[in-house]
Amino acid sequence: MNKPLPKAIFLMGPTASGKTNLAIELRKRFPVELISVDSALIYKGMDIGTAKPNAEELLQAPHRLIDILDPTESYSAADFRRDALKEMDDIVAQGKIPLLVGGTMLYYKALLEGLSPLPAADADIRAQIEQEAEQFGWEAMHDQLKTIDPVSAERIHPNDPQRLSRALEVFRISGKTLTELTQIKGDALPYEVHQFAIAPKERAEIHRRIELRFANMMEEGFEAEARALYERDDLHADLPSIRCVGYRQMWDYFDGEGTLDEAVFRGICATRQLAKRQITWLRSWKELTWLDSDDIDGALELISTQLEKK
């Protein structure tokens, strides 16, 4: 007989949906260990603006893959998959269940389905692309991508030089488009995965929570935290860390764009848009059980029932 696959739990959801609170309750009741699935929580020194679990919450439920990088560093879906698999193996070896909690859907997808065989970065080709962009502009580079790979060009904005450069680089290295290569599946996740998404039933409730969270962040010192990053000489607005919602709007404010109140308003709007994209992605997700964030007891019961099924 084949050995049964180890269990794993995905706890997904839009920002401000109550994922952390539910994860803490789950850890009290089940033999689980938490792994963060969040492209912002990986950064050190970015605590308030990312709504990182506080010291008390981390004491109740330690999260792996939090505070692992400096904001100068980049972190890909491939990096996450590698690190998450290592942490999952370690948790299973302890006789526990990995509980992956967060809202970065691309990370979940990479972990669940594996990654396409994309070529490694090539510094020479990347430098050549950047030189062309300096000469002709990123709009012209985007037009070039439209000719080569219209599907990727539709998804990638001309003002996103990192992703635009990568799409062109992939084609120049491999002779295949990013669209072609991403259709090739990688290794599937060797776990029995139970997938849940938590959200309030009403969209207005998400909006209310986002506004409340932003108000709390400002009271806790988000402006000072963001300014400390801005005053570093090794950070700039195009880094993935600084493109995180909230930080980007504060950065623009420090650059002289509008008032602090306007920056906060833009941050709230950007966070709402993020939540909307997360919900749209989750609605297309297969084999997903939805949980009501206003009924934690009911959510715990649903999770318990599903875990005991197999």
UniProtKB/Swiss-Prot annotation:
Keywords attached to this entry: ATP-binding, Magnesium, Nucleotide-binding, Transferase, tRNA processing
E.C. number: 2.5.1.75
InterPro entries with a match to the protein in the record: Dimethylallyltransferase (IPR039657), IPT (IPR018022), P-loop_NTPase (IPR027417)
Single GO term (MF): ATP binding
Organism: Aliivibrio fischeri (strain ATCC 700601 / ES114)
Residue positions binding substrate: 15-20
Biological function: Catalyzes the transfer of a dimethylallyl group onto the adenine at position 37 in tRNAs that read codons beginning with uridine, leading to the formation of N6-(dimethylallyl)adenosine (i(6)A).
Protein name: tRNA dimethylallyltransferase
Domain of life: Bacteria
Annotated region (Interaction with substrate tRNA), positions in chain: 38-41, 162-166, 243-248, 276-283
Catalysed transformations (reactions): adenosine(37) in tRNA + dimethylallyl diphosphate = N(6)-dimethylallyladenosine(37) in tRNA + diphosphate
Cofactor: Mg(2+)
Family: Belongs to the IPP transferase family.
Site (Interaction with substrate tRNA): 104, 126
Quaternary assembly: Monomer.
GO biological process, one term: tRNA modification
Binding site for ATP: 13-20
